[in-house]
Design a protein with these regions (language model features):
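Class I S-adenosyl-L-methionine-dependent methyltransferase catalytic core
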Residues: 1-167
Length: 167
């Protein structure tokens, strides 16, 4: 996940799903953004213009969850897409425990261990990398956009329920 993607259609439906899950199970859901600074990925990443699917803000999707919809409206402004600010202010913190530390290639293991400690009280953790599950473990910059298989195994060994989308 990158700040610039915050508030796109994927976030809208992800937040609806996590809020619903939290309410039905009567427990907070962990959300590990797999937050990445695009500068760490290189110049080509900085020049991408993907993640701009915000047409849902112009139609009647607001009826699904008006609170989430109103919070997403702010992110039409690119400059306001700051995950840390969002997680401090959103009503969703009642339902979701957000892990906001940025992952880096050189400190990935330390970052992951911090996430494990952070989610010690959550039974269910939603993993939100840019590109889904890696085919193999790697320490490359590009691997920051993926969940590593070893990370999933570790969470499972701790009896966590892991949810993520494969792209």
């Amino acid at each position: 996940m990158q700040d610039r993607y915050l508030g796109d259609v994927h976030d809208f439906y992800k937040f609806i799903f996590l809020k619903y899950l939290s309410k039905k199970l009567k427990q907070k859901i962990g959300l590990n953004w797999y937050l990445v600074d695009p500068k760490e990925l290189g110049v080509s990443e900085l020049n991408k213009n993907d993640g701009e699917n915000r047409k849902f803000l112009k139609n009647k999707t607001s009826i699904v969850d008006t609170k989430i919809f109103k919070e997403m409206l702010v992110f039409r402004d690119y400059k306001k897409r700051i995950i840390e600010n969002f997680t401090e202010r959103t009503h969703l913190k009642e339902y979701i425990n957000f892990f906001n530390l940025k992952v880096s290639a050189s400190q990935r293991l330390d970052w992951f261990n911090k996430s494990v400690n952070f989610f010690s009280d959550e039974k269910i953790i939603f993993l939100d990398p840019d590109n889904g599950l890696a085919k193999r473990n790697s320490s490359s910059r590009e691997s920051l956009k993926y969940v590593m298989i070893e990370e999933v195994k570790k969470y499972i060994s701790l009896r966590k329920i892991i949810v993520f989308m494969i792209s």
